[in-house]
Amino acid sequence: IEAYNEALAIKPDNAEAYNNMGVTLADEGKLEEAFEVYHKSLTIKPDYAEATENSLILAVQLLPIIANYGYNFNNSETQLSSEVMLRPKYQVKKLIKTFLEANFTKAHSHNTNFNACDRKLLSRLKPKDRIFCNAYSSFIGNLLDATWDKEPAYENKVYHLGESHCLSYAHRNITIEDSNFRITPRITFGAKAFHFSRKKYDSFKAITKAHFVSLPKNSKVFLSYGEIDCRPNEGFISAATKLEKPLEELIDQTTEGYVQWFFDQNADQKHYLYFINVPAPVYNKGYSADLNSEVARTVALFNTALKKYSLQHSFDMVDVFKFTAGNEGFSNRLFHVDNIHLGAKALPEIEQQLS
């Protein structure tokens, strides 16, 4: 931050410095301050694509409490040039926003726009951003293409906090203990169990906490975190090798910290928490048999630890592994809508566990 302040002292209208400062502040969980400096960046340079996308990625994750941060989607859109709007990242953020708002017609059109984006623009994205865009476009596309019965939108809500998995059953109805609820998603992109287990305060905790404390007290809350931690390249498996720590120990400690964090946040909220475990992984033909087995073992270890610690704190656990597992702990492919996420077909199975 000091470096950016020095740059701004030399050149006060440095839109790039404000944008970079926004990224750093967001990473530190200082969300209000991040929005303020993104706003400054865009005041200097209204069609600055990076700052537009960075503020949008934060704003989408803070639906529907974004008004508390002085951010207005409509005002933010009026100054945009068509060049920014044609960018793949912009269309995917709008796809996620409209899907979160249950505006399926608009979501369809943003997905169509994304798929019509200039492939050159897509190839210029950082690999991480390209994967993000393609994954959300495909996943939400599958959710939109599923059958949507004309069910009444129940007044009672069960809130589903999580990373992309919180979209699996979004805007669907579910019966819990003879009462009907509508499942309402609250997303934190890329959040892992690991993020909640460590001391550091960051955007993952800040966004999740903002949602958690904004819900009416005594709400029913589904929690979906941990699947990213079980992937071969961005969680327990690579961390265990790097830290030279046994996988079991690392998973146990992380899961304990993850559940404890939500227990601590819940002291004043008194929500009914349901920890949703990780579904059986889809066998990935791109990995070796050994790596596939390691992923399956990781999922099993995480789910065991999650059961142990959620029970310790008297929370409920929803076991999606149980009905998604086929041979050797891999997915039976009956409930997955892609290689990672479950879809609405899982709901009757989940309902059975909650009745």
Question: Can you name each region flagged by the protein language model?
Answer:
Residues 16-27, 50-57:
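Conserved alpha-helical positions within TPR/SEL1-like repeat arrays
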Residues 209-250, 282:
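Oxyanion-hole/transition-state-stabilizing segment in secreted/luminal serine hydrolases
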Residues 226-229, 263-297, 322:
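Active-site segments of SGNH/GDSL-like serine hydrolases
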Residues 283-320, 340, 345:
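Substrate-gating cap/lid alpha-helix
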